[in-house]
Amino acid sequence: RFVFNTCGTVVRHVQVDERYAAGTHASNVARVVLEEQAVAVGALDSVTYASIVREYFEPSVATEIAWRLGVQQAACYDVVSACAGPLVAIETLRGRAATDPHWKRGLVSTASLSEGFLGFDIQSIADLDELAAGLTIGNGATATLVGREPFARGGRIVGSYSEGYPGHHPLCRAPVFGVFRSAGSALFALAELVPDHVRRACARFGWAVEEVDVFVSHQPSDRILREVAQALGVPAARVPQLHSFYANTEASAVPIALRHLVDDGTIQPGMKLLLNSAAAGFTLARVGVVWEG
């Protein structure tokens, strides 16, 4: 109860049917998004899986997603950067767009399925610090389209910026044969790195922090987001806290937050959005977007 109250955890969505793995969930969501955006499967030049890879090492999960969708030919690869995966994948696709004139559009998919990889046997204070974060993890799957031309619904990417702080690598880990463990208090303390990274990202995009209308963020804890808003000197309302709706859905958190804020009317055409994530490793990632509706 202490952990839930501290983070603001109310609901955790979990997968209970073991027949449906990451590739299945990711492709199911992708079909919905492709239909909404009126994009044919054959029009995809790339398929990227941007979640934590948990089920197998080869081939790439992206190839499974593409196969389930019926893609016949496209670049397929995984971008694994823990919770920051989708934003790092978008940055990777921006690089591809800059170097490959034939690339037109790509799919970025996530499927955050953590059941079976979390440990809840808390017997000591040390266990509480290392395992408590797992209590707030929820499951989810998302699909995002990135392309040179506008889609029926979306925004224009103005920049991306990711940076690693590998000195903090030991703080969080999910071994192949084991459960997720995180030095919770030390990892959460790294939130102090976020405001400066946000300022540098905005400067790269030609924005002032005060110009950002909505900070669409990873959702590890409502309290952390409130503290970041205070450190940046922006109203808490511009940093929506959605942890209570979905818990921490790892790599799926930012796309889920974006869809939620579009659907509930928070995000309107013309708004400047800063997509934000932090990940084990330690990695910070930002993508600037002007929403076009």
Stretches with model-predicted labels:
Residues 54-63, 110-126, 161-177, 220-227, ...:
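Active-site-adjacent elements of ketosynthase-type condensing enzymes
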Residues 98-136:
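Flexible, glycine-rich active-site loops centered on histidine and acidic residues
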Residues 29-45, 196-213, 232, 261-266:
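Phosphate/pyrophosphate-binding loops at sites that engage ATP/ADP/AMP, CoA/4′-phosphopantetheine
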Residues 176-243:
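A contiguous, well-structured pocket-lining segment that forms one wall/lid of small-molecule binding clefts
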Residues 1-19, 122-192, 196, 278, ...:
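Condensing-enzyme catalytic core mediating Claisen C-C bond formation in acyl metabolism
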Residues 23, 27-30, 53-54, 67, ...:
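Claisen-condensing/thiolase-fold acyl-transfer catalytic domains that form or cleave C-C bonds
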Residues 80, 106-112, 138, 146, ...:
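Short beta-strand segments
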